């Protein structure tokens, strides 16, 4: 198929409180803000932008689909060199792990945690 995308440009996560989400992402990921206004904050995460958007603004992007409330409906996985070391660093930053570190039957060593709005992040090697 000609012109098929070669990467994900941005992921938009709908959040209840942009300030709370910003504090979490800056503390946990240590990323500088790429762009911010009253209803959003954008971070450059490798080659992908992570956009934290106030849930109140989400309908404009996805209408006519309904805006979901809460709960894990997807997981974002980030490749890391040392899952155990990063887990120790994350817990030192106040992050509660959902699971792991553990060796998965299909090969990788993983651990997972969620942000204040329930978006699940997995680290894997």
Predicted feature residues:
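Amphipathic alpha-helical segments
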Residues: 17-32
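Vicinal oxygen chelate
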Residues: 1-9, 31-78, 87-114, 125
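Short, conserved charged micro-motifs
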Residues: 20, 82-87
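Polyanion-binding surface elements
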Residues: 12
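Conserved active-site tyrosine of GNAT-family acetyltransferases
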Residues: 21-25, 90, 118
């Amino acid at each position: 198929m000609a012109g098929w995308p070669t990467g994900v440009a941005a992921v938009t996560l709908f959040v209840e409180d942009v300030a709370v989400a910003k504090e979490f992402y800056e503390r946990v990921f240590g990323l500088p803000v790429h762009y911010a206004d009253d209803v959003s904050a954008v971070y450059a995460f490798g080659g992908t932008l992570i956009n934290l958007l106030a849930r109140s603004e989400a309908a404009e992007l996805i209408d006519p689909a309904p805006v979901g409330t809460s709960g894990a409906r997807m997981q974002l996985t980030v490749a890391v060199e040392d899952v155990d070391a990063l887990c120790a660093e994350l817990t030192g930053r106040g992050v509660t792990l959902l699971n792991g570190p553990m060796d998965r039957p299909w090969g990788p060593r993983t651990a997972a945690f969620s942000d204040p709005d329930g978006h699940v992040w997995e680290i894997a090697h």
